[in-house]
């Protein structure tokens, strides 16, 4: 038997639109934009529910996951959230973390991928405790249930550290039973293009500075060569 630990008192610690199963299960599932949370729980998941926003929604999810050290797998399934691109944002957060100053998820393509309520130690705990299983855009119940059972069979036991409890502000977004309207794909595309333009402007500036230095060096070399040639010519004439 693998080792199990007690979740934080009152787990799940953050309210939300989810279904709770066996708290000793090693599997959690986010169904992203789809309301098929009963499917993973029926197969043995500890908790399952949608996650519609790439900021507060992810923060709430992380708070509930790291407060239960028994959960070692996070299955991303259901339809991707248009505009928010929440599933990809979760993967990017797990792989890359956040910018320490701006708090944006590094590599996320969603419209507003910022993590402000989870400290660095909470993000590191999420990265170490959980393995991400990508079934994004998969809504087939049999496929999801099979993956849940596969993860249960690979249960490595509870994470070595005790439950970590982080308070997340719950006002405004994704309250229980509330639908969060997705950002229009056009808006998300504009946001992404603006970020790309900013990056390209910085690259162009660096390139211009480099070429300016090279040009300055070439001009200096030409002037030295010209002076040397003139001096040599005068000496030969004399």
Swiss-Prot record:
Membrane-crossing residue ranges in chain numbering: 219-237
A single cellular component GO annotation: plasma membrane
Co-factor binding details: Binds 1 5-hydroxybenzimidazolylcobamide group.
EC id: 7.2.1.4
Pfam families per record: MtrA (PF04208)
Residues given in the record as 5-hydroxybenzimidazolylcob(I)amide binding sites: 84
Membrane topology listed for this record: Single-pass membrane protein
Membrane-side (Cytoplasmic) residue stretches: 2-218
Signal peptide from the UniProt entry: none
InterPro entries in UniProt: MeTrfase_MtrA/MtxA, MtrA
GO biological process assignments: methanogenesis, from carbon dioxide; methylation; one-carbon metabolic process
Main location: membrane
Cofactor: 5-hydroxybenzimidazolylcob(I)amide
Enzymatic reactions: 5-methyl-5,6,7,8-tetrahydromethanopterin + coenzyme M + 2 Na(+)(in) = 5,6,7,8-tetrahydromethanopterin + methyl-coenzyme M + 2 Na(+)(out)
Keyword field contains Translocase: yes
Protein name per its UniProtKB record: Tetrahydromethanopterin S-methyltransferase subunit A 1
Lineage of the organism: Archaea, Methanobacteriati, Methanobacteriota, Methanomada group, Methanobacteria
């Amino acid at each position: 038997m693998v080792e199990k630990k007690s979740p934080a008192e009152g787990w799940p610690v953050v309210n939300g639109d989810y279904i709770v199963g066996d708290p000793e299960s090693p599997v959690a599932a986010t169904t992203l934009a789809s309301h098929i949370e009963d499917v993973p729980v029926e197969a043995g998941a500890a908790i399952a529910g949608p996650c519609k926003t790439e900021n507060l929604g992810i923060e709430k999810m992380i708070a509930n996951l790291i407060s239960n050290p028994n959960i070692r797998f996070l299955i991303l399934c259901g339809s991707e959230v248009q505009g928010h691109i929440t599933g990809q944002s979760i993967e990017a957060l797990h792989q890359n973390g956040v910018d320490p100053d701006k708090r944006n998820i590094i590599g996320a393509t969603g419209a507003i991928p910022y993590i402000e309520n989870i400290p660095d130690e909470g993000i590191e705990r999420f990265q170490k405790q959980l393995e991400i299983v990508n079934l994004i855009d998969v809504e087939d119940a049999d496929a999801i249930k099979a993956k849940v059972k596969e993860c249960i069979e690979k249960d490595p036991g509870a994470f070595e550290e005790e439950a970590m409890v982080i308070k997340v502000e719950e006002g405004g977004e994704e309250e229980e039973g509330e639908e969060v309207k997705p950002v229009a794909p056009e808006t998300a595309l504009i946001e992404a293009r603006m970020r790309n333009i900013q990056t390209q402007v910085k690259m162009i500036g660096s390139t211009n500075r480099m070429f300016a230095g090279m040009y300055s060096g070439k001009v200096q070399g030409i002037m030295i060569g010209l002076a040397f040639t003139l001096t040599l010519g005068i000496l030969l004439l004399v």
